Amino acid sequence: MSLLSLSWLGLRPVAASPWLLLLVVGASWLLARILAWTYAFYHNGRRLRCFPQPRKQNWFLGHLGLVTPTEEGLRVLTQLVATYPQGFVRWLGPITPIINLCHPDIVRSVINTSDAITDKDIVFYKTLKPWLGDGLLLSVGDKWRHHRRLLTPAFHFNILKPYIKIFSKSANIMHAKWQRLAMEGSTCLDVFEHISLMTLDSLQKCIFSFDSNCQEKPSEYITAIMELSALVVKRNNQFFRYKDFLYFLTPCGRRFHRACRLVHDFTDAVIQERRRTLTSQGVDDFLQAKAKSKTLDFIDVLLLSEDKNGKELSDEDIRAEADTFMFGGHDTTASGLSWVLYNLARHPEYQERCRQEVQELLKDREPKEIEWDDLAQLPFLTMCLKESLRLHPPIPTFARGCTQDVVLPDSRVIPKGNVCNINIFAIHHNPSVWPDPEVYDPFRFDPENAQKRSPMAFIPFSAGPRNCIGQKFAMAEMKVVLALTLLRFRILPDHREPRRTPEIVLRAEDGLWLRVEPLG
């Protein structure tokens, strides 16, 4: 039998065996992987030295806990962006760098690159996959481009025009509830809670043509949507739950699975019922019936969509897009509306000017209803809304993973394999872009002032090829609801100052409380 000489180790010769050889090969492979990873880690670290970084807690924790999802964390972030206006690196532990980009000129290089170079396939987005599937938010590559082309017509102004009446009716229901509460002596409201229900009510009508009356009574579907949103936030704050197989063994994971199934069943039922109607009536008669009702909902548009080769969206694709729109459309709009009411409550002179603008627009009109063409006739209200979206952006941040090196305008390079945090809150609070960024000043958005700024200085709906496809829908809804609210109520601050908390959207810890006074 052949012998394997280990004399150089000071050991006597032993008989060679397949197991020993396998052990040596395995150990060599593992050592090679460790050496390769170590080299790549240090090489990446050297390349990142061109980006400044705050002082670490220590070598092991890095910057963990520096910017927390709390009011204090946002204040720290504001200080960091004043110190590092171009951006900075944060280390989450000893081995995970995150490149935080805070300046429009730097952000442009990342946002405007192809999605093949900067993708969204990173940890946070994966936690949404069981709920949202491969909708526009999560899909990448050819599938994303194909769906984006097919969905763009769904947000054409001819489709959006009839939704104005839906926005108004949902706002009317919310306002009637506020009037009742005021008569009962309850003038202090958590406006975020009320507006979230109102936006969910509108979305259900716009997407499914379904009225659940969720503002007046509990709705199983709406409750499931709100539970899923809360569970996603909770999951992303607990690192050990990132793996699906671990998460779905937990009580929260099982609740998530049940809520997902309920939401999917509802969407599937609507799609199947609508497809049966379309098949039995034929496209022409179906469209004729829709023309009489003057509303083509989101499901209708998706069912009728086809590419140049005649390929339609599958039922699974339609469900993913409908669920994505429900997820992306309710809390973001609720956040934007809640914070603009807060800012106008703190600045009564701007609130009164907005109110006078709406009153002047509708003075000869009964009933007092907003129409599509009116939205362009509210310039000061629009300025106030945009300034609030700057100061309190609904989506505080989003991330991109770099699959290739990205060269910045100043010749620095973001190395392949790193995650970039496009920090909308930091960009909007950057003193090198916005003088006195903590001051609420609607005149920043006077058209003359706006022309002087980079288009990347104000990106509440993201920017570039993957910007929010529903931003016109969201802006229209916010303008309608804000105008009608100011027409009917005076908004006053509460003694409780809100503590901002950046979750998926920018919320207020323990609610955003304001006082509402009905106007005569």
From Swiss-Prot:
Domain of life, per lineage: Eukaryota
Tissues with expression: Expressed in the epithelium of seminal vesicles, in renal cortex, in adult and fetal liver, in epidermis, in corneal epithelium, in sweat glands, hair follicles, epithelial linings of the ampulla of vas deferens and of the stomach and small intestine, as well as in the transitional epithelium of the bladder and ureter (at protein level). In the epidermis, expressed from the basal cell to the granular cell layers. In the corneal epithelium, expressed in all cell layers. Also detected in prostate. Up-regulated in the epidermis of psoriatic lesions.
GO molecular function: alkane 1-monooxygenase activity; heme binding; iron ion binding; monooxygenase activity; oxidoreductase activity, acting on paired donors, with incorporation or reduction of molecular oxygen, reduced flavin or flavoprotein as one donor, and incorporation of one atom of oxygen
GO biological process: arachidonate metabolic process; icosanoid metabolic process; menaquinone catabolic process; phylloquinone catabolic process; prostaglandin metabolic process
Reactions performed catalytically: an organic molecule + reduced [NADPH--hemoprotein reductase] + O2 = an alcohol + oxidized [NADPH--hemoprotein reductase] + H2O + H(+); (5Z,8Z,11Z,14Z)-eicosatetraenoate + reduced [NADPH--hemoprotein reductase] + O2 = (18R)-hydroxy-(5Z,8Z,11Z,14Z)-eicosatetraenoate + oxidized [NADPH--hemoprotein reductase] + H2O + H(+); (4Z,7Z,10Z,13Z,16Z)-docosapentaenoate + reduced [NADPH--hemoprotein reductase] + O2 = 20-hydroxy-(4Z,7Z,10Z,13Z,16Z)-docosapentaenoate + oxidized [NADPH--hemoprotein reductase] + H2O + H(+); prostaglandin H1 + reduced [NADPH--hemoprotein reductase] + O2 = 19-hydroxyprostaglandin H1 + oxidized [NADPH--hemoprotein reductase] + H2O + H(+)
Cofactor(s) recorded in Swiss-Prot or TrEMBL: heme
Coiled coil segments of this chain: none
Binding-site residues for heme, renumbered to this chain: 468
EC nos: 1.14.14.1
InterPro entries: Cyt_P450, Cyt_P450_CS, Cyt_P450_E_grp-I, Cyt_P450_sf, Cytochrome_P450_Monoox
Transmembrane segments: 15-37
Transmembrane as UniProt keyword: yes
UniProt subcellular location: Endoplasmic reticulum membrane; Microsome membrane
Enzyme class: oxidoreductase
Keyword Lipid metabolism annotated: yes
Record's keyword terms, sorted: Endoplasmic reticulum, Fatty acid metabolism, Heme, Iron, Lipid metabolism, Membrane, Metal-binding, Microsome, Monooxygenase, Oxidoreductase, Transmembrane, Transmembrane helix
Pathway(s) per entry: Lipid metabolism; fatty acid metabolism
Single GO cellular component term: endoplasmic reticulum membrane
Membrane topology: Single-pass membrane protein
Free-text function comment from the UniProt entry: A cytochrome P450 monooxygenase involved in the metabolism of endogenous polyunsaturated fatty acids (PUFAs) and their oxygenated derivatives (oxylipins). Mechanistically, uses molecular oxygen inserting one oxygen atom into a substrate, and reducing the second into a water molecule, with two electrons provided by NADPH via cytochrome P450 reductase (CPR; NADPH-ferrihemoprotein reductase). Catalyzes the hydroxylation of carbon hydrogen bonds, with preference for omega-1 and omega-2 positions.
Similarity comment: family membership: Belongs to the cytochrome P450 family.
Protein name: Cytochrome P450 4F8
Lineage: Eukaryota, Metazoa, Chordata, Craniata, Vertebrata
Gene: CYP4F8
